[in-house]
């Protein structure tokens, strides 16, 4: 059983919903990343999604784009991100860490070299935004051979064929993008999410995390009423951008604790 599977099994046994926060590695400053990861756990995160900075993050809105730019300006690389996961693992052996990013940095390192390095660092899942599941079989096998779950996105526009393709290659969980558009988009249509999830579950025998458009305890709780897990990203990255210097870690912990409380209520 992978760390991600164990986490979702424990949540199901307690009838709880998963909380999956996203932060960009190296933002707002590189020295804070490991502390921020621990703050997320202290606040009640079940899985951490760690964004790998990239110069052209096409699926991301302006908030996460700016975070990527700040991290890259500070010289943050994929190798550095793996080092932070290794450091986090020195004192946390239980919380799954999922890297989320784009194909380019992985391909520059080489898929096999990346899979080996990520597995050795303690990475549990990898979500490559621009890897279509139909063309990912060998990549998925490479990930699993190194103890990593390949995670894929589904969207309101995903066809049955795409959902089936994800069902064949994904493990861990799938990430359902609840809105058309980029991360940080505004309104959330709960009814359409609720209608879509059973169709996904027909083809994908995995927990479904729902993200995009979740900004506060209220929207998190609404999504938690229909999904297995709630993914929250842009709102956290915005919070870190706005937090006064020296207060980022505690601000993040407190915000996540509020979301956790709402999910468990």
UniProtKB/Swiss-Prot annotation:
It comes from the Bacteria. It catalyses: (1S,2R)-1-C-(indol-3-yl)glycerol 3-phosphate + L-serine = D-glyceraldehyde 3-phosphate + L-tryptophan + H2O. InterPro entries: Aldolase_TIM (IPR013785), RibuloseP-bd_barrel (IPR011060), Trp_synthase_alpha_AS (IPR018204), Trp_synthase_suA (IPR002028). GO terms for cellular component: cytosol. Its EC number is 4.2.1.20. The keyword Amino-acid biosynthesis applies. Keywords: Amino-acid biosynthesis, Aromatic amino acid biosynthesis, Lyase, Tryptophan biosynthesis. The active site is at 49 (proton acceptor), 60 (proton acceptor). Pathway: Amino-acid biosynthesis; L-tryptophan biosynthesis; L-tryptophan from chorismate: step 5/5. Signal peptide: none annotated. NCBIfam families: trpA. The alpha subunit is responsible for the aldol cleavage of indoleglycerol phosphate to indole and glyceraldehyde 3-phosphate. Belongs to the TrpA family. HAMAP family: Trp_synth_alpha (MF_00131). This is Tryptophan synthase alpha chain. It comes from Cupriavidus pinatubonensis (strain JMP 134 / LMG 1197) (Cupriavidus necator (strain JMP 134)). The lineage of its organism: Bacteria, Pseudomonadati, Pseudomonadota, Betaproteobacteria, Burkholderiales. The gene is trpA.
């Amino acid at each position: 059983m992978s760390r991600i599977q164990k986490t979702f099994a424990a949540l199901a046994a307690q009838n709880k919903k998963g909380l999956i926060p996203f932060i960009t590695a190296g933002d707002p400053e590189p020295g804070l990343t490991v502390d921020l990861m621990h703050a997320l756990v202290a606040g009640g995160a079940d899985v951490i999604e760690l964004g790998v900075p990239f110069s052209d993050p096409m699926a991301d809105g302006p908030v996460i784009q700016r975070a990527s730019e700040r991290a890259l300006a500070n010289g943050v690389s994929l190798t550095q991100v793996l080092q932070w996961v290794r450091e986090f693992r020195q004192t946390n052996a239980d919380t799954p860490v999922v890297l989320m990013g784009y194909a380019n940095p992985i391909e520059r390192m080489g898929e096999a070299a990346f899979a080996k390095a990520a597995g050795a660092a303690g990475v549990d899942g990898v979500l490559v935004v621009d890897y279509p599941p139909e063309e990912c079989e060998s990549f998925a096998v490479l990930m699993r051979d190194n103890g990593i779950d390949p995670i894929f996105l589904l969207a309101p526009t995903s066809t049955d064929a795409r959902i089936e393709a994800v069902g064949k290659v994904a493990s861990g969980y799938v990430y359902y993008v609840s809105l058309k558009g980029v991360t940080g988009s505004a309104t959330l249509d709960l009814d359409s999410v609720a209608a879509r999830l059973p169709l996904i579950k027909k083809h994908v025998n995995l927990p479904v995390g729902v993200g995009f458009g979740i900004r506060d305890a209220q929207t998190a709780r609404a999504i938690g009423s229909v999904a297995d897990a709630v993914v929250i990203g842009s709102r956290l990255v915005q919070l870190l951008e706005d937090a006064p210097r020296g207060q980022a870690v505690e601000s993040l912990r407190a915000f996540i604790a509020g979301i956790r409380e709402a999910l468990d209520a």
